[in-house]
């Protein structure tokens, strides 16, 4: 059996979650990973369209502003995202942070998958011919924080 740092982190987070979910159902592992998966696809669609206004209800104010700056920066350079066929292979909760010292509850999700992700000139056609060399495996960490009875995306790493 191959042990990795991430598998150890998943085990530790899982142990914490099993205790936390008994006190509050928001800590349900399945709901947390599904929320991460859902928001991932919404963010990718919004980046592809270059319009993130619909994401406000899924991101913290800080997370929304960071994403908006990224999109605005691309606009100023006449660039755009091309995101096609993203496939998630795994979503794992790797860290759990119960509320402490005026910081809200939070968790970090590791999202692994594969897809076409590239930034190109806005005026170029968005054909996928020749983009097969842009298919990449990805592994990203997203920080979520609790707001009421909901998890919001705060930071994309």
Each language-model region and where it sits:
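Juxtamembrane and targeting peptides
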Residues: 1-38, 42, 121
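Short, exposed beta-strand "edge-strand" segments with a Pro/Gly-rich flavor and a Y/T-containing core
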Residues: 21-27, 52-59
